[in-house]
Amino acid sequence: MLADDWTSLRDVQYRKIHLYDLDWAEDEDRHLDRCLVVVAKYGGAVAMVRDETKLLKMSAKDSIVPTLRVCNCAGGTISETRLDKAVQAPGTASERGRLLTMGWTDGEMLVMVRERGGVEVRDIMGELSKTLELVDDSSRRSSEPDRVEACEVWGDGVVALMGSGKVKAVSGIHSSEPRHFSMAAGLGAHAAPLTAMAVLEPQFTASGALEVVLATEDGNVLGAT
């Protein structure tokens, strides 16, 4: 065993052990630096889709419509689903914009959040289960509609920082009627840019409620409850 296999973290020593290569290792379509990639807890499913926020070189065989790929932890394909950018919530006619982020819930549902506030909830086979909206109708119809600036998916929902400085949250995402609510964070539309956001789930907080910690570029750390 070589000494350079080990890395020090304060007074703890650890090393990485190579177990196996994922099945997609030679697949040009699955280069991780081109994709948004999220992994479910405890060695669960891996979801990946082309990162629409990056400027990527595409070949003639590439489709403009992104494909959502769900794999097992060894890289074996579970499902592939072409994503229609214009998936709409009932009663709305606007597109949802680029995909900003996605994540797995505790119930292994994939939550996909778009920049204009549209949320898609899909199962492990990529089938659309439900759609939600983080932007209300009045804002959507205004000349400067609110947008999602940053977002985190947690075990039972999603939390988003909007361009207006509001923090919006959804809980009970697995239920037939998820709960939508706003959280007070003290951020305005002209606050310093966000540098980090962490979601503290109810089972881990003293209050027993969902809490969010926000850090801004000017060194402020704010809590939203």
Label each region the model flagged:
Residues M1-T225:
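WD40-like beta-propeller blades
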